[in-house]
């Protein structure tokens, strides 16, 4: 059916969503066009394999950009010769080489390890100008929300959806709710966007934004730089949101102008005119509104194993004795035991073993400048075993080196590394040893996130750097800086040939001049007459899933909240290029312990005990099951084990979506109903019967326990009929072609994409001249 946007006031999210609707089904699902697709080595192998098996191609290589980041070592590449000799871990090397083969086979633009532009996907997109305001951006990575800082609708997707976007350049979506978080006033000196977003997550919890797109607004947000805004939106996913967005403004335009893939000339002017309309209208309705006073935010760190375990640095480790909710109390006790902390311990007294500055949250040039200002003229504390600085991209690294930041870090005792995800998730050689405590600028502090039994505390770059110097957590506002009058080199590009490569990491000399804001551009209704696409349609496929009708099986209880995807399947099991063989990895850290010989020994975890070894239904009492990363390996592992349905109060949005793509049925039920009616049966190893056509849950005797559970009509239709999403979408080829014709005309400034990149003669960095300028620490 033809989609007609609301005529009333709309939010920023509404406007971007409306502008990308290709088709709306009668059951309420939407087919959205995707402007930008970022691809990396971990979540793409199975997607490309699916394309090859179905005889399909990548529909829009110009809208696609690939790189390697998760698996690669961050040690020096000075003597890099080949992947075979450089990447020592066999499974990591296989994923990287598989991506290289896939991008060659399908013609996808790619920044490999010998390309100076290689880096973390969420760093290279913005710095190259591939990310643009008002676009839809997806990647097989949950922190794709980063790009929402540009006023784009950006969200993580699973591998099945990666394949869907590669094949159709579209994605099937339900409309999310609107949430606005307004930060009134100005942040106090010493407070960063990392402190602010940790404060927000601590306030609303990791499920606070579930089902919503969060718009960050207010004076404090508008005062942030683009890189600080990216840190905010990066962690919107940790608040449970589908995406985070900030309206584009002059700060956005100035950052974007002149980037290699940004529009030029008349197309730039056309783009800015449109981008200026992308703001929430007066009177637009939000489903949820939260107001925060900026003055209330002070330096914030995490103490436990969830980003919501955030406290002001002036606080102390919480005491479970003060918690009445049994699930929350149990979770707090587990977190304290895992983190090796005692209740009521002052946070500033906690000692640190290692420091990590980097990641897609805080690996940009401003982050490195902030940390360098702290460590200048200082030395690492004697108890610090290792402190690493890992730039977010090769261009960030070169910029930092041109400013002399690498020397500042190295003189203080920090290691200066190559670009990559590094110790953020430990899929590469950078990991913590068991029980080591890390001051980290990354985004997740889950159990085992940075290595088996690792202990992670999240904080800002300045706070992490200060912890490295002091040897324990400190309040950055009390930290004594040294040598602030010293000069630091600042680069001057000396060759026109270098500008195409380097401009992404350098300040721009020509800021955008303010212009009169045009009238809001209305979204055109799609014409009824199909327009022939310039692209050959992808082939339909007969592939599909087994229909899901009724399921009667043993039910297993899981009395936990915030069960993240790192817990469902740890990072070491992600190094595969197949969708199967992941049964052993399911809840690995809970199901197994190493014996004295280093062999896996089963624990008494429920799925290791009869009769639950044969469980097909998992009954969870706590909220937010499957929160965290976009790894589709989580439902793959559940499916491999034999679990076909999960029942929980709520889910992480990406996990919930990924489950349906693999024929699993995640059911949302009120927590008390689960506890009162289902858990008694699950605790006994009894069977439950899930009747999807009638949306009921029964016991083994046929007694109705739940007379109705909710499920979106389109998802139910696909499960009951075993339908393949890609096949369904390709039946709408005429609508996709029609939208692409509209896009070429109305949004012509998006048409260049990654095809504008230069690969044949990427210029090598020539010697640069430097001038010296005082370091400016922008609080």
Curated annotation (Swiss-Prot):
Positions bound to [4Fe-4S] cluster: 360, 421, 424
Catalytic activity from the UniProt record: (2R,3S)-3-isopropylmalate = (2S)-2-isopropylmalate
Record text on cofactor binding: Binds 1 [4Fe-4S] cluster per subunit.
Basic and acidic residues bias spans: 501-510
Pfam families associated with the record: Aconitase, Aconitase_C
Record-level GO cellular component terms: 3-isopropylmalate dehydratase complex; cytoplasmic stress granule; cytosol
Enzyme class: lyase
MF term (GO), any: metal ion binding
Metabolic or biological pathway, per its Swiss-Prot or TrEMBL entry: Amino-acid biosynthesis; L-leucine biosynthesis; L-leucine from 3-methyl-2-oxobutanoate: step 2/4
Sequence positions bearing Phosphoserine: 488, 495
Extra information: Present with 96300 molecules/cell in log phase SD medium.
Protein name: 3-isopropylmalate dehydratase
Organism of origin: Saccharomyces cerevisiae (strain ATCC 204508 / S288c) (Baker's yeast)
Gene name as annotated: LEU1
